[in-house]
Regions:
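Conserved ABC ATPase "signature" C-loop
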Residues: 223, 464-465
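Conserved ABC nucleotide-binding domain
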Residues: 131-146, 371-387
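H-loop/switch region of ABC-family ATPase nucleotide-binding domains
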Residues: 204-205, 445-447
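Conserved signature/switch motifs of ABC ATPase nucleotide-binding domains
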Residues: 84, 164, 196, 405
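Q-loop/switch helix immediately C-terminal to the Walker
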Residues: 93, 100-114, 346-360
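ABC ATPase NBD coupling module
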Residues: 71-88, 114, 233-238, 324-334, ...
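Hydrophobic anchor residue at the start of the ABC signature
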Residues: 158, 186, 399, 427
Length: 515
């Protein structure tokens, strides 16, 4: 059987610096290959080189064969003609892949109409509507991309790439930002694509996703393959020290953090309720935040976690209730965005953006180098624009930017969703160490239940319950509204074993509670 993808001796250079060295891989019909490794290790560079859309400042070498079409890695024009029909890409930044001016239903419909063309007797509109419904997006057909949560935008992009019918799928962090139930469904859809004969190249930091997809796995570190083999073998009995450390660094193995110590009140919210697009997200939420406090925020994709943060930060007015803030500095409340690319000026170097920030708020630039060292970032990285660094590196730069202003409250919206497990641990340690030194409160949005439980016993949980129970939680003395956690989502492995579990959907309508 001929291969759908063959990569030989792929290398990528930025001037004299080697970013990727002698990468090789082969994929046949129905096979899966998953790339794991540190942020900035070169995983996305492999996908970009295969697609032929590397940044102009980078130089590629090696040979890439897609089906019967063979070309040198630097001959990008030869592969761009295969986009959509032979290669489908699910990008790491879904908002950048969607037309910001077009409703999502029409975007999927156009893929069926102009790219697929052989989709069968059903109309493109019907196929598009069914595709969105299958991914839990009923009622969102007329929404524009900016009206969707990060997880919803990821699912729309996923529906578009599957609609193309391309035999080779490249999925760059396909489950990033999704709750556990939707992650299970996306993995199930990827496995179905494999059963239908697609070849699948996946980039992920989620080792459970890698294990569920099976096939082969390659581990990259500093642009080189350090280990490869059958997924079950590599993840259960890793040989390379980096792979061993990566497997051991999952949040479920972390020691719990000590409880919060009582401190001065920063913010109090009473009876908060909010709707978006005619949908009630939450209501009756009472919440107080004290200096130095840690609170985890969790719930299904699209349930209002980011909206809650925007309310607390003063970026949106609440539909119901009131918020009293005891921090008066204009930069005292800071946000780490789920998609950091959208939070930086695209044509400025990162250094210029950070220097301008320091000048605006009269902060010493000298602190920047120390923060970069703590976050494992080289100073030379700042000479690039936002598009010239990986998503994980950019998120760490965003964290450095927030810490420069010494905020009283940080709303961290999935700040480690782009990071490998080791870098996630390092980044959260820096965040917590800096927050503790400055008595900054941190609200952490996460879909990882292990990470949420490690971070804090106080959890804001947005789900479908009609109203929160406002009894006190004596276990940690919190004065938040409290309610028990929603029913547990089955493990990914179990969800993939049974059709019933694979079809489980997280509820959509969401009052709020805190545990």
């Amino acid at each position: 059987m001929s291969a759908l993808l063959t990569v030989r001796d792929l290398s990528v250079h930025a001037g004299r610096q080697t970013l990727l060295r002698d990468v090789c891989c082969t994929l046949h019909e129905g096979e899966a290959l998953t790339l794991i490794g540190q942020s900035g290790a070169g995983k996305s560079l492999i996908a970009q080189a295969i697609m032929g859309n590397l940044p102009a400042s980078l130089r590629a070498g090696g040979e890439i064969t897609i089906g019967t079409a063979s070309s040198r890695a630097e001959d990008v024009a030869a592969r761009r003609g295969l986009w959509g029909r032979r290669i489908g890409l699910l990008p790491q930044e879904p908002w950048l892949a969607l037309d910001p001016t077009m409703p999502v239903l029409r975007q999927i419909e156009e893929t069926y109409r102009y790219v697929r063309q052989d989709a069968g007797p059903l109309s493109p509109a019907r196929l598009a509507r069914d595709a969105l419904a299958r991914l839990g997006l009923q009622g969102k057909e007329r929404h524009l991309p900016h009206q969707l949560s990060g997880g919803m935008a990821q699912r729309v992009a996923f529906a578009a790439v599957l609609a193309s019918g391309a035999p080779l799928l490249i999925a760059d962090e396909p489950t990033k930002g999704l709750d556990e139930a939707m992650r299970n469904e996306v993995v199930t859809l990827l496995r179905e694509a494999l059963l239908e004969g697609c070849a699948l190249l996946t980039i992920t930091h989620d080792l459970e996703v890698a294990a569920a997809l099976g096939g082969q796995v390659q581990v990259l570190q500093n642009g080189e393959q350090v280990e490869s083999g059958a997924c079950t073998q590599v993840l259960s009995k890793p040989r390379h020290p980096y792979t061993q450390a990566l497997v051991a660094a999952q949040p479920k193995h972390w020691a719990p953090l000590p409880p919060n110590a009582p401190a001065r009140l920063l913010l109090a919210a009473e009876g908060l309720g909010q709707s978006l697009g005619g949908q009630r997200l939450f209501e009756g939420l009472d919440l107080s935040i004290r200096a130095g406090e840690r609170i985890a925020v969790s719930g299904p994709s699209g349930c209002g976690k980011t909206t809650l943060g925007n309310l607390l930060l003063g970026l949106l007015p609440p539909d119901q209730g009131r918020i009293i803030r005891h921090e008066m500095r204009p930069h005292g409340f800071q946000k780490l965005y789920q998609d950091p690319v959208a939070a930086f000026a695209p044509r400025q170097t990162l250094r210029r953006s950070l220097r301008d920030l320091c000048a605006l708020h009269r902060q010493p630039v000298a602190r920047l180098d120390g923060l970069l060292d703590d976050l494992g970032l080289g100073a030379g990285l700042l000479e690039r624009p936002p598009g010239g660094v990986s998503g994980g590196e950019l998120q760490r730069v965003a964290l450095a930017r927030a810490l420069l202003l010494e905020p009283s409250l940080i709303f961290a919206d999935e700040p480690t969703s782009r990071l490998d497990l080791l870098t996630q641990q390092q980044t959260l340690e820096v965040l917590l160490r800096s927050a503790e030194a400055r008595q900054s409160a941190v609200l952490l949005v996460t879909h990882d239940r292990h990470l949420a439980r490690w971070f804090s016993p106080a959890q804001v949980i947005l789900d479908t319950r009609s109203n929160p129970d406002t009894t006190a939680d004596s276990s940690h003395g919190s004065d938040h509204s409290v309610r028990s956690l929603p029913p547990g989502v089955p493990p990914l492995s179990a969800a993939l074993r049974t059709p019933q579990a694979a079809q489980h959907r997280a509820p959509r309508r969401a009052p709020a509670a805190v545990r």
